[in-house]
A protein has these predicted regions:
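Beta-propeller domains with acidic blade repeats across secreted/periplasmic ectodomains
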Residues: 1-170
């Protein structure tokens, strides 16, 4: 379907095609003539870091708001949207509306993987805290520049940080 992309970390179907994160890019691919090869190949975002393998961009996931969420990774860079500067990212995650391609920063900025529950509450993780709840979503924090929130995420794992991890691969 697609060749010459390095290290894809996430795939999310949309509108007959797929969004793919392959650090340092977010792509959109679509087959328009039925030959099982992507005829549309768009580089949507670029600039994600590749320096820390446990914290590269990843995790395309639909939210209840019909936006796609993903971890931007911990590599601070200024992202380029279709070749033009978008905004710098550091310890945040992102979401975007796939119809308008409007991007926003969201609370997170941890490592690999995240999820939403049935009520839209977002959970993130890192290698030392395997389950954290996003308590203060960025879209609410940015409404009041005078509100200083501490602890944007909280640890919710019953067994605490640094719980045993068991491989499922050989």
């Amino acid at each position: 379907f697609v060749d010459n992309i390095s290290w894809p970390t996430s795939v999310r179907p949309y509108n007959g095609g797929v969004f793919v994160i392959a650090p340092g890019f977010l792509y959109y691919f679509k087959d328009t003539d039925g030959d099982n090869k992507a005829d549309i190949r768009e580089e949507i975002l670029s600039g994600f870091g590749r320096g820390n393998v446990q914290s590269v961009s990843n995790g395309l996931e639909w939210g209840l708001d019909n936006k796609i969420y993903f971890a931007a990774g911990r590599n601070p860079k200024t992202l380029l949207y279709r070749g033009k500067p978008l905004f710098p990212v550091g310890a945040v995650d992102l979401r975007f509306d796939p119809r308008t391609e409007e991007f926003e920063q969201v609370t997170g900025g941890l490592q690999f993987g995240h999820s939403h529950d049935a009520w839209g509450i977002r959970f993130v993780c890192s290698n030392s805290n395997h389950m954290q709840q996003v308590v203060y979503p960025q879209q609410y924090l940015s409404r009041n520049p005078y509100f200083v929130a501490q602890g944007l995420v909280r640890n919710v794992a019953k067994d605490g940080a640094s719980a045993p991890v068991f491989r499922i691969s050989p």
